[in-house]
């Protein structure tokens, strides 16, 4: 993380939120009034413009925001930010999160602090982190049958079946193992506090240039999470015949697989520019979100 104090100040701001969340829409209205008071140009996600017709704002897709805005604010949970990140990363537009969800590792501004914390960011008081994403390609013979990207993780699952999956893992062209399990999580450091953590994987600091591979209920007790270099190329060869597994990016709708399909995973060339207000601390976030104990008398 590097500090960007009193440098770039944002004026063209895009807003993204979940339309089905009344709490998010309430915070959006508050945010719009505040931004107009700061003489900012506001562009609203086209999927929610119909829920706020009284605001009279310009509507745009996430891609259009990436081209036109110098800051995008996502109001919602980490899932909302994950969806925005997969589109916005290629445009290098900074992204700021307001938490209207659950854990909020990525959306770290509380609703009660919207005006004060967003105000600090508009004044040029913020820090930024560059988080890498993963590219997914599914190959069937010489044909690419599916693609995707993920900020958190790419997950191989058994899908609708209760049977285990058989697959072979290759890293940078080297055979690692053949495994029978319920699946495999390939996670970035960002995703290490999400599904990978539930699967027994390690917490990885966001600065790390690494990936972690976490087996899901492997049939052998010696199959443990494996941390590899961030520029590694991961290939998973599906060898199971009884099951039609799924591979999913950040929990989105999966790609159905069949025997002899090959999943190829590598780091994307573009990174997400994630903005934090002053005082952001990864370890404090872990204490708050994961219930770690604090010093006596310390509320954080």
UniProtKB/Swiss-Prot annotation:
Xref: SUPFAM superfamilies: NAD kinase/diacylglycerol kinase-like
Record's keyword annotation contains Transferase: yes
Molecular functions per Gene Ontology: ATP binding; metal ion binding; NAD binding; NAD+ kinase activity
Main location: cytoplasm
Superkingdom assignment: Bacteria
Subcellular location: Cytoplasm
Broad class of enzyme this protein falls into: transferase
The protein's required cofactors: a divalent metal cation
Catalytic activity: NAD(+) + ATP = ADP + NADP(+) + H(+)
Binding site for NAD(+): 78-79, 152-153, 163, 180, 182, 193-198
Entry GO CC: cytoplasm
Disulfide bonds: none
Biological process, per Gene Ontology: NAD metabolic process; NADP biosynthetic process
Keyword NAD: yes
Pfam families reported for this sequence: NAD_kinase, NAD_kinase_C
Role: Involved in the regulation of the intracellular balance of NAD and NADP, and is a key enzyme in the biosynthesis of NADP. Catalyzes specifically the phosphorylation on 2'-hydroxyl of the adenosine moiety of NAD to yield NADP.
PANTHER family in UniProt: NAD KINASE (PTHR20275:SF0)
Protein name: NAD kinase
Organism name: Alcanivorax borkumensis (strain ATCC 700651 / DSM 11573 / NCIMB 13689 / SK2)
Gene: nadK
């Amino acid at each position: 993380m590097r500090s960007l104090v009193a440098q770039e100040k944002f004026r063209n701001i895009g807003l993204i939120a979940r339309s089905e969340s009344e709490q998010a829409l309430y915070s959006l209205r508050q945010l719009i009034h505040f931004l107009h008071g700061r003489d900012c140009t506001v562009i609203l996600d086209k999927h929610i413009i119909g829920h706020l017709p009284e605001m009279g704002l310009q509507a745009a897709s996430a891609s259009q925001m990436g081209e036109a805005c110098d800051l995008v604010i996502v109001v919602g949970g980490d899932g909302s930010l994950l969806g925005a990140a997969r589109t916005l990363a290629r445009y290098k537009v900074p992204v700021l999160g307001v938490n209207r969800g659950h854990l909020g590792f990525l959306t770290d501004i509380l609703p009660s602090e919207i005006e004060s914390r967003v105000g600090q960011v508009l004044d040029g008081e913020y820090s930024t982190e560059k988080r890498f994403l993963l590219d997914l390609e599914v190959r069937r013979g010489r044909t690419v049958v599916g693609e995707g990207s993920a900020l958190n993780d790419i997950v191989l699952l058994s899908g609708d079946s209760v049977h285990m999956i058989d697959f072979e893992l290759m890293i940078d062209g080297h055979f690692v193992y053949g495994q029978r399990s319920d699946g495999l999580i390939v996670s970035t450091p960002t995703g290490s506090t999400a599904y990978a953590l539930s699967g027994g994987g390690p917490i990885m600091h966001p600065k790390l240039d690494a990936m972690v591979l976490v087996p899901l209920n492997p049939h052998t007790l010696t199959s443990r999470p494996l941390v590899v270099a961030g520029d590694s190329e991961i290939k998973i060869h599906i060898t199971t015949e009884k099951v039609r597994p799924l591979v999913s990016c950040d929990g989105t709708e999966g790609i159905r697989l069949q025997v002899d399909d090959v999943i190829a995973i590598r780091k994307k060339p573009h990174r997400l520019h994630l903005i934090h207000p002053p005082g952001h601390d990864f370890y404090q976030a872990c204490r708050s979100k994961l219930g770690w104990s604090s010093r006596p008398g310390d509320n954080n």
